[in-house]
Every structure is written in structure tokens, then in C-alpha cells.
Amino acid sequence: MIGGLGWGELLIILIIVIAIFGAGKLAGLGGALGSSIREFRKAVKGDDEPRSDAKTEGETKV
């Protein structure tokens, strides 16, 4: 698994993290992390698509 950690060890770590931060705080952190990842993916994907407001080389206003 992850660096030699099994399911039992991961479960113990999860229980300790929930005990330290609390279930409500952990849910908030998870939501913030999810929205951050979503925004990052949207920004990365947006760079591949041509922008509609970008001018081409031949289009310059005088």
C-alpha cells in the first residue's frame, strides 16, 4: 500500500486525526481541499483551450 502502511495502520491514523481535529473541522478541511483541487484542474484545463477574447496576430486595431 502507501509506503508499507496497511489498512489497519491507515485506520488508526484516521481515528487519531478525527480525535485531534474533530469530525466537523475535518469535513470542512475536506471540502476546502476538494474545491481547491477542482479550481486547480479548471485552471489547468482552461489553459489548453483558446480564449474567445484573445486577438489573433492579424487583428490589431489602429
From Swiss-Prot:
Keywords: Cell membrane, Membrane, Protein transport, Translocation, Transmembrane, Transmembrane helix, Transport
Keyword Coiled coil attached: no
TM spans (from-to): 10-32
Domain of life from the UniProt record: Bacteria
GO BP terms in the entry: protein transport by the Tat complex
Protein function: Part of the twin-arginine translocation (Tat) system that transports large folded proteins containing a characteristic twin-arginine motif in their signal peptide across membranes. TatA could form the protein-conducting channel of the Tat system.
Record's signal peptide: none
Membrane topology according to the record: Single-pass membrane protein
Regions annotated as coiled coil: none
Native species: Chloroflexus aurantiacus (strain ATCC 29366 / DSM 635 / J-10-fl)
InterPro entries: TatA/B/E (IPR003369), TatA/E (IPR006312)
UniProt name for this protein: Sec-independent protein translocase protein TatA
Gene name in the database record: tatA
Organism ancestry: Bacteria, Bacillati, Chloroflexota, Chloroflexia, Chloroflexales
Subunit structure: Forms a complex with TatC.
Predominant localisation class: membrane
Stated family: Belongs to the TatA/E family.
Localization: Cell membrane
Gene3D superfamilies: 1.20.5.3310
NCBIfam families xrefs: tatAE
Pfam families noted in UniProt: TatA_B_E (PF02416)
GO molecular function ontology, one term from the record: protein transmembrane transporter activity
GO-annotated cellular components: TAT protein transport complex
